[in-house]
UniProtKB/Swiss-Prot annotation:
Gene: mscL
Organism classification: Bacteria, Bacillati, Bacillota, Bacilli, Lactobacillales
Role according to the record: Channel that opens in response to stretch forces in the membrane lipid bilayer. May participate in the regulation of osmotic pressure changes within the cell.
Stated family: Belongs to the MscL family.
One GO cellular component term noted in the UniProt record for this chain: plasma membrane
Stated name of the protein: Large-conductance mechanosensitive channel
Gene3D superfamilies: Large-conductance mechanosensitive channel, MscL, domain 1 (1.10.1200.120)
InterPro entries given in the database record: Mechanosensitive_channel_CS, MS_channel, MSC/AndL, MscL_channel
Amino acid sequence: MLKEFKTFIARGNVIDMAVGIIVGAAFTSIVKSLVNNLINPLIGLFIGRIDLSNLVLTVGDAQFKYGSFLNAVINFLIISFVVFLMVKAINTFRKKEDKKTEAPSEEVMYLKEITELLKKNKE
């Protein structure tokens, strides 16, 4: 059972996924810092409040902390945009790879040449 587990863990997909999760977590903390320390103060300058996370709407005893929600939305938009750019770059790279592999191999070129010579000899 331990051997099977080692085989499972050693597979590329599991390792790639683990690396992706770790990098994603690190990237999320960078984006949160970007939003909290740079973007929110910039937005706060325009609306007259420096800390958006403290924006609260109080109705009776209920408090709606929409500032924290705005932070989460900004985080989501930035992360989604960066992921979109990464996927777009990967797809562009894959298309270039596909174009490279579409060129016929040397063997195929020789076979075509032989076929053409055989056709000429039959005529």
